């Protein structure tokens, strides 16, 4: 009798977890060149319940392109990835938040893997592995293999980074206070706090990450990808690291938060 009750309770728990709504939050800034393709691909991923694009004040056609998608909600607020993702999280309706950068593409079964991971009540969040892919204009053939050095981090680091399509239970995200609205390393800072809240999993599937940043400054990007996290752990502030990096995320005018639902 007890075994039967436990079986039904476990089945019910799995059923509830599988019904979790997933809200995708995508921070963008001047992404007109790629946002249409990214959203088209994202809409083909089964099992995603909500897509929110949070624009940080683009000066190109990014906002107009996003508005052309009836299934996507557009939010506009001040620039800064942490601020933008927090704004999206406040508006999201799902029980799970999936933070997706504009140069990252999900595998077709991403939602199923997320829900499967969260059937374990001890799991508070997780991320995917990465696989960097070159842009069409890769200048030198030998740069291609170097792209994948960054992919090693996603397999062996215990702390997920933002380009790994991080996901987290909504209640846990808000309990932790969301992302710190700092200039750089907001993803690593949040992951450190998330690890203290419970178990973090790495899904055995890869997201595709554009190699555009690497191709623009290959040596500098490799150094930054390896050294900056270490410097941050040693106490160098996100603002200082952003100044060294050039803080390419920032730009455009600062606007008051607003939301447009299509």
In which residue ranges do the predicted regions lie?
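Hydrophobic helical membrane-anchoring modules
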Residues: 3-5, 9-17, 192-262
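Short, well-formed alpha-helical segments that are part of the catalytic scaffolds
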Residues: 30-44
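Acidic helix N-cap motif at the loop->helix transition within catalytic regions
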Residues: 33-37, 60-68, 109
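A conserved acidic beta->alpha catalytic loop
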Residues: 41, 55-63, 104
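Conserved donor nucleotide-binding strand/loop of the catalytic core
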Residues: 49, 63-91
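Acidic donor-binding/catalytic loop of UDP-sugar-dependent glycosyltransferases
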Residues: 61, 102-116, 192
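Short aromatic/hydrophobic "clamp" motif used to bind/position activated sugar donors
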Residues: 97
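Conserved donor NDP-sugar-binding/catalytic core segment of glycosyltransferases
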Residues: 109-140
């Amino acid at each position: 009798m007890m075994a039967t009750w436990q079986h039904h309770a476990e089945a019910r728990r799995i059923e509830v977890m599988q019904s979790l709504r997933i809200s995708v939050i995508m921070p963008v800034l001047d992404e007109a060149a790629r946002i249409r393709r990214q959203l088209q691909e994202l809409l083909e991923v089964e099992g995603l319940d909500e897509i929110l694009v949070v624009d940080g004040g683009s000066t190109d056609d990014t906002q107009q392109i996003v508005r052309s998608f009836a299934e996507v909600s557009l939010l506009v607020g001040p620039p800064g990835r942490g601020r933008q993702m927090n704004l999206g999280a406040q508006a999201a309706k799902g029980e799970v938040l999936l933070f997706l950068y504009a140069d990252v593409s999900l595998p077709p079964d991403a939602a199923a893997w997320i829900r499967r991971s969260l059937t374990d009540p001890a799991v508070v969040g997780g991320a995917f592995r990465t696989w960097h892919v070159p842009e069409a204009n890769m200048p030198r053939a030998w740069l291609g293999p170097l792209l994948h050095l960054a992919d090693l981090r996603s397999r062996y680091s215990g702390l997920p980074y933002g380009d790994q399509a991080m996901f987290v239970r909504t209640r846990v995200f808000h309990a932790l206070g969301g992302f710190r609205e700092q200039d750089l390393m907001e993803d690593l800072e949040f992951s450190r706090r998330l690890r203290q809240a419970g178990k973090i999993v790495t899904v055995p599937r890869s997201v595709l990450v554009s190699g555009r940043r690497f191709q623009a400054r290959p040596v500098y990007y490799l150094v930054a990808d390896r050294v900056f996290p270490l410097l941050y752990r040693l106490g160098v502030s996100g603002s200082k690291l952003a100044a060294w990096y050039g803080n390419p995320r920032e730009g455009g005018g600062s606007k008051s938060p607003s939301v447009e639902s299509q």
